[in-house]
Amino acid sequence: MQKQIYDTVIIGAGASGLMAAVTAARKGLRVLVLEHMEQAAKKILATGNGKCNYTNADQSLENYYCEEPDFIRTVLAQFSCQDTIRFFEELGIRPVQKNGTCMYPESGQASSVK
């Protein structure tokens, strides 16, 4: 068996782990994602009632509970709703806005995000 060399190992194939893996791979890194469950991204399939509400256009501070509001401001300034939409569009997943602020894949199926 040939030994594999990776630049980055990501533990967990949930939404954050998979986004981190895509981001690292885009930078040219060799990435390994480890997941202990049988299926990667299983929780993604349940979001948005099976349609994958992957971001929300209303990112007002009052929508977040945190003892440090500056932390939320910093996070949202670093990766906004528009950044999330762009990330998925680059993967070929076009957004549709429903219920005023919720963003879903145009396909209407969470499996298209997985």
Residue ranges and their predicted role:
Residues 78-114:
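Feature captures the FAD/FMN-dependent oxidoreductase FAD-binding
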Residues 45-78:
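N-terminal glycine-rich dinucleotide-binding loop that anchors FAD/FMN and/or NAD(P) in oxidoreductases
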Residues 2-16, 32:
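Beta1/beta-strand and adjacent pyrophosphate-binding region of the FAD-binding site
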Residues 21, 73, 85-86:
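Short glycine-/small-residue-rich flexible loop motifs, especially phosphate/cofactor-binding loops
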Residues 13-16, 20-25:
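Small-residue (primarily alanine) positions within well-ordered alpha-helices
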Residues 7-8, 70-74, 103-104:
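Short, contiguous strand/loop micro-motifs
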Residues 20, 29, 36, 112-113:
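General structural feature for long, well-ordered alpha-helical segments within catalytic domains
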Residues 9, 25-49:
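Glycine-rich FAD pyrophosphate-binding loop
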